């Protein structure tokens, strides 16, 4: 039957020739000459040396057997091919690289148009991360001195010539990236005001992934020691998925230690005595136990529910909260698999998000009265549970649990089984994931969660459909309410869209929506729910969809 076919249809692959006309020449951006680079980088490398010496002195004796190392951040304009070999040739450990497209242009670094003329566009480049000890730092400085003095670089290390030519900045990875860029300092500042100083504050520590398992275990031991030195603790085991280069631990510290950190960073030195926050093995500090799904109270729309027996095996799955399987619209249409009995954590009225998503998958927008329900069962495996400590018992993954682990285990259970249980849903083709991490906007590189989806998609040949939530913050329209309301509707839409465009750097997609192998679902400024009461709200995009 046609209704039993897969829901997705893809066109035949075909080769599309490039458009005719003048070819676009993509070249390297302008960089300063040798003399100016020597002047610029000499100061940066001197600062780098001094920072590393201070770090060595500060960690001396803090952890037995800890070898002082540092993660170098090298930002370059343009690109350098095959740089990894050059990094490893001088004893540094390659940690990764990613594109950057927001280097401010200046007289030294700028993009050129097809005529070779300077433009005011942000400069595109690459960011390289490498980890090195004192010997690696000495080798780096030796190469720098040779390049500075116009001497030939040793064989196998000549790529450093290109790097020094194109380097915008070289520095140590530090508190700016690990704490400030992730928003943790602002989050803790807001959190601590009414908190008892002795209360434990939980968070997640993402570690730089080391290829050696021994080094990964040593990083965990070092973190545990540094936590204990400040009356903190590691919660549960570490999470490590080698195939995706993920390594993290759950941790907690007394609120007074977090307050100490904030006070010290606001002091004249802008430094802290808490070694955990300066440990070279830490990539990011992030919140844990976040609410991953947003639901709103409201009345449903009355509509007719199609009846009939559904017994065809599922090809669609949902990873979400526990749905109400006895709901009139869902009864007999879901195949619920709850191996951890998360259903027992729910009270009446808690099953909101899972029920809403199951209804959307099974029926679509029922208010339009056009879509027929799916003729197949839909497989549902809960990965969230209510948070008993939140005011509205919002659904989350508990502090001590890695949600990457829950997702990996859920998908493995579908296709391979678990323990004595066989594969629970091997016919699945599409997995719906309508949750996102509000604390993890996309920055630089795909998150561990996104990388996990990419790998699971490849391993099990399954498609993830990700809808990671709406941007929750206010939109700054740069006008008073009176001035805005005086505009015509088309001008309102035009003005608001320009304001949103200007704020795009802060309006990033939420993890895991940046997954490459997944379909990321956007939203339109319209639905089929009919009229609704706006109250004091103003429609910023009147007539738009």
Range-by-range predicted roles:
Residues 2-57, 61, 68-73, 90-199, ...:
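Autoinhibitory propeptides
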Residues 72-83, 206-219:
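Short, surface-exposed ligand-recognition loops at beta-strand->loop->(often short) alpha-helix junctions
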Residues 187-191, 255-257, 294-305, 362-366, ...:
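Short alpha-helical segments and helix-capping/turn motifs at coil-helix boundaries
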Residues 195, 241, 306-309, 369-371, ...:
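A general structural signal for short secondary-structure junctions and capping/turn motifs
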Residues 207-211, 253-257, 320-323, 382-385, ...:
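Short, flexible loop/turn elements at secondary-structure junctions
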Residues 218, 387-515:
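Substrate-binding/access-modulating region of protease and related hydrolase catalytic domains
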Residues 304-338, 344-403, 425-427, 441-442, ...:
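Subtilisin-like serine protease catalytic core
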Residues 322-329, 493-545:
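Extracellular S/T/G-rich loop segment that most often corresponds to the catalytic His/Ser-adjacent loop
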């Amino acid at each position: 039957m046609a209704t039993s076919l897969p829901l997705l249809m893809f066109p035949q692959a075909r080769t599309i020739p490039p458009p005719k006309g003048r070819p676009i020449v993509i070249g390297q951006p302008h960089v300063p000459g040798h003399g100016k680079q020597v002047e610029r980088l000499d100061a940066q490398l001197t600062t780098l040396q001094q920072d590393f010496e201070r770090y060595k002195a500060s960690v001396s004796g803090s952890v037995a057997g800890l070898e002082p190392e540092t993660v170098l951040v090298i930002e370059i304009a343009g690109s350098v091919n095959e740089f990894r070999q050059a990094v490893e040739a001088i004893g540094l450990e390659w940690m990764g690289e990613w594109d950057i497209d927001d280097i401010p242009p200046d007289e030294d670094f700028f993009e050129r148009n097809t005529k070779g003329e300077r433009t005011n566009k942000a400069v595109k480049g690459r960011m390289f991360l490498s980890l090195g000890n004192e010997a690696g730092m000495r080798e780096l400085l030796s190469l720098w001195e040779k390049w500075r003095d116009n001497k030939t670089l040793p064989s196998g290390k000549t790529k450093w010539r290109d790097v020094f030519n194109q380097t915008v900045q070289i520095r140590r990875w530090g508190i700016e990236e690990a704490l400030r860029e992730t928003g943790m300092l602002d989050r803790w500042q807001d959190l601590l005001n009414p908190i008892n100083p002795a209360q434990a504050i939980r968070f997640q520590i993402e570690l730089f992934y080391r290829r050696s398992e021994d080094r990964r275990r040593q990083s965990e031991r070092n973190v545990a020691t540094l936590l204990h030195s400040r009356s903190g603790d590691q919660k549960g085991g570490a999470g490590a998925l080698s195939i995706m280069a993920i390594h993290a631990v759950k941790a907690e510290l007394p609120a007074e230690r977090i307050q100490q950190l904030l006070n010290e960073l606001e002091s004249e030195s802008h430094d802290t005595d808490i070694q955990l926050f300066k440990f070279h093995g830490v990539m990011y500090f992030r919140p844990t136990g976040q609410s991953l799904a947003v639901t709103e109270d409201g009345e449903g729309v009355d509509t007719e529910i199609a009846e009939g027996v559904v017994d065809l095996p599922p090809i669609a799955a949902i990873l979400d909260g526990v749905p109400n399987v006895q709901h009139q619209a869902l009864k007999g249409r879901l195949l619920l698999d709850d191996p951890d009995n998360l259903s027992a954590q729910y009270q009446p009225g808690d099953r909101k998000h899972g029920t809403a998503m199951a209804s959307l998958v099974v029926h679509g927008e029922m208010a339009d009265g056009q879509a027929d329900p799916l003729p197949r069962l839909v497989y549902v495996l809960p990965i969230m549970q209510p948070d008993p400590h939140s005011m509205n018992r919002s659904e989350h993954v508990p502090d001590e649990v890695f949600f990457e682990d829950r997702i990996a285990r859920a998908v493995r259970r579908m296709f391979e089984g678990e323990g004595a249980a066989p594969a629970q849903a091997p016919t699945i083709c599409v997995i719906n994931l309508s949750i996102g991490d509000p604390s993890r906007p996309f920055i630089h590189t795909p998150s561990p969660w996104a990388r996990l989806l990419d790998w699971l998609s490849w391993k099990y040949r399954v498609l993830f459909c990700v809808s990671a939530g709406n941007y929750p913050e206010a939109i700054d329209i740069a006008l008073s309410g009176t001035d805005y309301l005086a505009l015509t509707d088309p001008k309102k839409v035009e003005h608001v869209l320009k304001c949103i465009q200007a704020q795009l750097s802060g309006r990033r997609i939420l993890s895991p929506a940046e997954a490459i192998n997944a379909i990321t679902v956007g939203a339109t400024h319209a639905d089929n729910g009919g009229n609704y009461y706006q109250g004091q709200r103003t429609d910023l995009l009147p007539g738009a969809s």
